[in-house]
A protein has these predicted regions:
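Histidine-acidic metal/acid-base catalytic patches
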Residues: 10-171
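Eukaryote-skewed repeat-based solenoidal scaffolds used as protein-protein interaction platforms
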Residues: 2-9
Length: 171
């Protein structure tokens, strides 16, 4: 789904639209979606929520991870460089739901910045992969027992700070 490019209208601008239209087809089990992080951001949605929604419906066929600074044009920035917490949430929801265990793969839909020298023209891919791997390690270390305790005690500020400390290497 892509909400506003190349024009400002789209029949299936979000994962929800894709799934609704696919349900009306003669063979909905053959239809799924490709979630791109930046496209969800362009639609004003949280990419991790879109991923989780599609996975819960059994309809996430692939993901294209990247990043975006606001609702401008599709920037295809390196994954995690603008919205690190959002990037972490995307990696975490993919891991929690076993994405990749059945042959699915993660794509990196990123592009080099306009004035990048030829010899540096692949750094955006390297940076995206390094950030993904680092966030995967953080997701592996996530303390679900602490999360349960915080939710039980309604200590959402404590949980929020735990996640931030985890991302900053303080937890």
């Amino acid at each position: 789904p892509k909400p506003n490019e190349p024009i400002d209208r789209s029949i299936c601008g979000t994962m929800g639209h894709v799934l609704a239209v696919s349900a009306a087809t003669i063979d909905p089990k053959r239809v799924g979606g490709n979630l791109e992080s930046a496209h969800a951001i362009l639609a004003g949605l949280d990419p991790a929520h879109e991923i989780g929604f599609a996975m819960a419906m059994g309809k996430l066929m692939t993901v294209h991870l990247n990043d975006q600074n606001g609702i401008k044009y599709d920037q295809d920035k390196a994954f995690g460089v603008e919205n690190l917490r959002s990037a972490f949430n995307q990696v975490k929801v993919l891991k929690e739901n076993g994405y990749g265990e059945n042959g699915e793969y993660v794509g990196l839909d990123v592009k080099a910045m306009r004035t990048t020298r030829d010899e540096d023209s692949y750094k955006h891919l390297e940076n995206s992969l390094n950030i993904f791997k680092a966030l995967e390690e953080k997701a592996d270390r996530f303390d679900y027992e602490f999360q349960k305790k915080c939710v039980k005690n309604r200590d959402f500020e404590g949980l929020e700070m735990y996640v931030m400390n985890l991302l900053m290497g303080l937890a």
